Amino acid sequence: MQNSEFKYLIRVSRTDLDGNKKLIMALQDIYGVGEAMARAIVRVAKLDPNKLAGYLTEEEVKKIEEVLADPAKFGIPSWMFNRRKDYVTGEDKHVIESDLMIIKQEDINRLKRIRCYRGIRHELGLPCRGQRTKSTFRRGPTVGVSRRKK
């Protein structure tokens, strides 16, 4: 394919990416990066989206990490970020990996602490978004119906 050395694992922002996958698919293995964000990163970094991730050079990996660190600086619109109008700072940012997991858990704990509807539903392990619970979200083993004796 290319003259450069093929690598089976590529380390991008604390995540090992599969070198056999196409670049857009490999970037989606990073927690917090979906298909739209992966396409935007590849477009902004001026990389071939069909290129296998194993053929990335060190410079290209650094460019991807720079875009992931501050996507707004590279012209990615704020509506693509996963943390708009942050509760603490009020700024738009895109958070990935363990930072996203921590922030997500802090948000849930804040909802529980202020005892809002969503927080209470989280505490009880029930759905927060209005789904019906008569037949779904049940816990425990299924109990069969016993027949009456004749």
From Swiss-Prot:
One of its GO terms (biological process) is translation. The keyword Oxidoreductase does not apply. The keyword RNA-binding applies. InterPro entries: Rbsml_uS13_C, Ribosomal_uS13, Ribosomal_uS13-like_H2TH, Ribosomal_uS13_archaeal, Ribosomal_uS13_CS. It comes from the Archaea. GO terms for cellular component: cytosol; small ribosomal subunit. Keywords: Ribonucleoprotein, Ribosomal protein, RNA-binding, rRNA-binding. Pfam families: Ribosomal_S13. GO terms for molecular function: rRNA binding; structural constituent of ribosome. Residues 131-150 are annotated as: Disordered. HAMAP family: Ribosomal_uS13 (MF_01315). Located at the top of the head of the 30S subunit, it contacts several helices of the 16S rRNA. In the 70S ribosome it contacts the 23S rRNA (bridge B1a) and protein L5 of the 50S subunit (bridge B1b), connecting the 2 subunits; these bridges are implicated in subunit movement. Belongs to the universal ribosomal protein uS13 family. NCBIfam families: PRK04053.1 (NF003140), uS13_arch (TIGR03629). Part of the 30S ribosomal subunit. Forms a loose heterodimer with protein S19. Forms two bridges to the 50S subunit in the 70S ribosome. This is Small ribosomal subunit protein uS13. It comes from Methanocaldococcus jannaschii (strain ATCC 43067 / DSM 2661 / JAL-1 / JCM 10045 / NBRC 100440).
